[in-house]
Amino acid sequence: MPTIKQLIRNTRQPIRKVTKSPALRSCPQRRGTCTRVYTITPKKPNSALRKVARVRLTSGFEITAYIPGIGHNLQEHSVVLVRGGRVKDLPGVRYHIVRGTLDAVGVKDRQQGRSKYGVKKPK
């Protein structure tokens, strides 16, 4: 327990909240423009070519976002919606692109888990 004199000398510091997605600035999603669309390889035990995009957000941040699902139509200057959520085997990728909104179309011929990939119910 500090004394009154110690508390006067230096006040108690508030606990700072550390966020896992700082570029979103406490928003659930952010809009951004793709500056580069490319593939990268995952960390050690895994092997693949994961599709990612470099995105300049409306908050001013330049981030790397993962493009989920099989096949995509994104290219440079595509306008996308970005949400938080990291990809465990891609270091530095802490955001996901939301499929089925703005310029990112939903995954073609998707039957299960459609809501996560922006696909309407098939007739």
From Swiss-Prot:
Disulphide bonds annotated for this chain are none
Query: In which organism is this protein found?
Result: Cuscuta europaea (European dodder)
Membrane-spanning regions, if any?
A: none
Briefly state the protein's biological role.
Answer: With S4 and S5 plays an important role in translational accuracy. Located at the interface of the 30S and 50S subunits.
Q: What is this protein called?
A: Small ribosomal subunit protein uS12c
Instruction: Please give the family membership noted in the entry.
Output: Belongs to the universal ribosomal protein uS12 family.
Task: Give the PANTHER family listed for this entry.
Answer: 30S RIBOSOMAL PROTEIN S12 FAMILY MEMBER
Q: Could you give the subunit structure recorded for this chain? A: Part of the 30S ribosomal subunit.
What keywords is this UniProt entry annotated with? Plastid, Ribonucleoprotein, Ribosomal protein, RNA-binding, rRNA-binding
**Keyword RNA-binding in annotation:** yes
Under the heading InterPro entries, the entry gives: NA-bd_OB-fold, Ribosomal_uS12, Ribosomal_uS12_bac
One Pfam family, please name it.
Answer: Ribosom_S12_S23
Which locations, inside or outside the cell, does it occupy? Plastid
Record-linked Gene3D superfamilies:
Nucleic acid-binding proteins
Q: Which GO terms describe its cellular component?
A: plastid; small ribosomal subunit
Please cite one Gene Ontology biological process associated with this protein: translation
